[in-house]
C-alpha cells in the first residue's frame, strides 16, 4: 500500500519563481502593463483590470497557478519602475510583501518595513533619511496567546477563557489571584463576596462546601437577608445571590471551577460577580442630545447607538444587581461636549436625564482653551488640541458626580477613544473601545498622502489617536467581522492599521493584530419600541399620518422639502443619512437619474442634509450643491422628493412603515459603512433593504434572502438590481413579502439590544478578571504608548489650529 509523503509548503517567492520560469512571457506582459502606468499605487481592482487586458491565452495559463493566486490576493501594487511591489493578503489578517524587477524578472521578499520604505519613495523619493521612527507593538504581544484560525477573529473572550482557565486553576498556588480578586470587591466601602475571614484557597473551599451543605437544607426561595449573618460569620458577604437557590447556584459554579475548570463555567461564574455599578461612556464631538439634533453636522447614528445602548445596559445592570441580592443604584453617564451656543437644543445644559431610564444621564463638559470656554461647535476633525484639558475636566466632573471611580469606561469614535484611554490610564479602570468608523479606510490613500488631507482633516492626528487607543484598551467591540478583518477580498478597518506609513512622521510596521483576543463582535440592534414591523397594525402611530403625508406628497416646496411626486401610486425607494461624501446619497440620486426604467417603476425619496439652516460643514455644502445640480441635469422633479433631515425618531419609525405600505425599499448606498444602523432599522420594520457591500451591511444582510448587497462603485449595476426586484414584485407581489419576512427574521435572530447589553457586561467581567489575575494589563506596551503620546500625538494635536470664536 502506497504511503502518503508529507512535503514542505513552498514559500510565496518560491512558487512565484517556479511560475516565472514556466510562464515568463505571459507574466512579463502583465508586469509591463503595470510598469507602463508609471510611478504610483494601483488598487486591487486596477491590477485585475490590467490582467483582464492581456491576451486570453496568456490569462488562462496564469489563472490557475501561483501567479493567479498572488493576483487574486494582491491588495495594492506599488509601481516605481523598474520595480513593482505587491502587498499580498492570502487570507484576512495574513500579509506577505514582495517586489519584482520587471526588466530582470527577479522576485524579492520584503519585510513590512522594507515594503513601507519602498512605498514612501512615491512621496519622498529616495531621500527620506536612514532613520525613521518605526512603531512595532508585536514584541509586547509575542509571549501572549493568540488564535490563528479566522473563525476565532472577533471571538476573543472565548479564546481567552479556553486558554487561561486551565492555566489558572492547575494547582492550589495558582488559586491565590482568584481569591484576591473575589476579596477586592466592594462598593463605597462595603465589602462584597468575601471578607477577611477567608485567608487562603483551602479555607475558601471549606467554607463553600459548608455553605452548600446548609443551603441544600432550606427553602430555595429563602431571601438572602435571612441567612446573611450566618454567612458573614464564615466569611461570605452579599453578592452571591438574592435567594438561597441563586446563592447555591453561584457557590456550586465556583466549586465546579475549582475542581475541574472549563471556559463555560468560568464565564458563567464571572457573569454573577457584582463588578459593574458605574459606567462612563464618552462621545465628545457633535451635538449630543435626545431631541432635534439628528442631521446636525457630525450628529447621526452614533448618538442613536449610544442612547439605545444605555437604555438596554441599565435594564441589564438593574436585573443583575437584583439577582446578586444587592440594593445598589447603578449610574451610567454619557460624557459629551457642552455647547453654550447650541440654540434650540439641550446641548448647553450640563446634566440631562436619558428618556426611558432611571439612572442614566448625559453629562456635558465644555472644551476650554487659554481664553476660557469654547462656545461654538467644532468639527470632529478639529477637536484634537482640546482633548487633553478636556480629559482632566471630565475626571474632575466624574469625581463630583459619582463620588467614586467608574467600573467601566467606554470610548466612542477617535476622540472619545483617546479621552477614554487617558481616563482609564489615570483611574486604573477597565476600558472598552468602539470605533464606529475608522477614517483611514473611508479615505483611500489618506495615510501615504496624508499631507494632502492635513489642512482639512488633520488625519495625522486622528490616525495617531486611533493607533494609541486601540493598543491601550482592554477590549474592543465591533459590530461586524468586516470591521476587524474585512472579507476574503476587502481589508478590514482595524486590519488596515496592521502596517502603514505616514511619510515624514513615522512608519507602523506592526500596529494591530486582528487575531488579538481583545477583539469581540457585539452587534447592536434597533429600538424595538420604535422600529417594529409594519404588519403590527395595532401599534401603528396613525397620529403621524398627516405629517408624513405632508412630507412625502405635498405639492408645496419649501425649506423642508423640494420637488414633488406626481404619481403617488408608485412604490418609493427611500434613503435616510447624513449628507456627506461617504454616505453617497448623491450617488444614489445619480444612479436613479440615469436609469429610465427605474424611474418608470418607482419614486425616489431622500432624507438628508438640513436645508432649513446654513451649513458650516464643508462636505455637506459640497454635497448640497451637487444635489441641486443632479435635480436640474436629470429633470427629477415629479419623481423625486428631497426632504431635510428629520429628527423625530419615533415619527421616522412610522415613516419606514409608510414606505412599506407603498411596497417600496430602503437603499443604503454608502461608499463604506462600518455597521449600518439604518439598515437594521429598515429591516426591523419589514422594509426590503439594498445596502452597500463595503462594511457591516454585508454581514447584516444575507443576499437574496433578507435583502440585497450593492456595490457603490458600480451604480449602474445597483440600479439594475433595483429594477429587477421591482419588476419581479410587479409580476409576483409575494416576492416583496418574502424579502420583507427574511429581513425581519434576520433581525430577531442577530440584532437586538438585549443580546448586546448582556455581552457587554459579560466582557467587562471577563476582561476585568483576566486583567487582575494575569499579565493582560500589558504594562510594557502602556509605557511604550506613554512615550508615543508625549513625543508624537501631543505635538500633532498642538499643530491643529484652535477654533476662532
From Swiss-Prot:
Its EC number is 2.4.1.13. Keywords: Glycosyltransferase, Transferase. Pfam families: Glycos_transf_1, GT-B_Sucrose_synth, SUS_EPBD, SUS_N. Residues 275-752 are annotated as: GT-B glycosyltransferase. Transmembrane segments: none annotated. One of its GO terms (biological process) is sucrose metabolic process. It catalyses: an NDP-alpha-D-glucose + D-fructose = a ribonucleoside 5'-diphosphate + sucrose + H(+). GO terms for molecular function: sucrose synthase activity. Sucrose-cleaving enzyme that provides UDP-glucose and fructose for various metabolic pathways. NCBIfam families: sucr_synth (TIGR02470). Belongs to the glycosyltransferase 1 family. Plant sucrose synthase subfamily. This is Sucrose synthase. The lineage of its organism: Eukaryota, Viridiplantae, Streptophyta, Embryophyta, Tracheophyta.
